[in-house]
Regions:
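Alpha-helical transmembrane segments of polytopic membrane proteins
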Residues: 54-69, 115-126
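Membrane-helix boundary connector in multi-pass membrane proteins
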Residues: 99-118, 140
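Membrane-helix interface "capping/anchor" motifs
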Residues: 76-89
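Membrane-water interface at the C-terminal end of transmembrane alpha helices
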Residues: 17-18, 124-141
């Protein structure tokens, strides 16, 4: 039997799995919406290596994306309340990784990368709030 009630939910050894879940949920929260919102006119971008990601970022819908990011953060924060900060940031981690990868392969892209990373930082706020709320809910249950 676990000494801490939080340990009974997800063992510490599964932190990597929850980080992967957080990254996938964040990726889906941002990239899927431009393609599934009815009536949304999507402008496609073909210049980058990851055209799917660029098209999704350029056609971002603020309110639905923010809502999904808060829910994603809340879910992973509930699973691992003691690691809510890491999990909140993990929801956005695939986007800077893709940008860095793209910058190495094609150095002429991402000329405004500091601004781009600032946007990723701003996009990490909703899942951080969700992860904090999820961790508080998880501790009480």
């Amino acid at each position: 039997m676990a000494k801490n009630p939080n340990e009974a939910r997800v063992p510490q050894s599964n932190l990597v799995g929850v980080v992967i879940i957080a990254a996938v949920l964040g990726f889906i929260s941002i990239t899927s919406l431009p393609y599934i919102i009815p009536g949304k006119k999507v402008v496609s971008y073909e210049a980058s290596l990851f055209t799917f990601i660029q098209t999704a970022i350029e056609n971002l819908s603020i309110l639905p994306t923010t809502s999904l990011l808060i829910l994603s953060g809340g879910f992973v924060g509930y699973l691992k309340p003691e690691n809510w900060r890491l999990l909140g940031f993990s929801t956005i981690v695939l986007f800077p990784i893709a940008s860095i990868f793209e910058m190495f392969l094609n150095p002429t892209t991402h000329n405004l990368w500091p601004l781009e990373f600032l946007v990723y930082g701003v996009l990490s706020i909703p899942p951080l709030i969700g992860a904090l709320l999820g961790s508080k809910i998880g501790v009480r249950i």
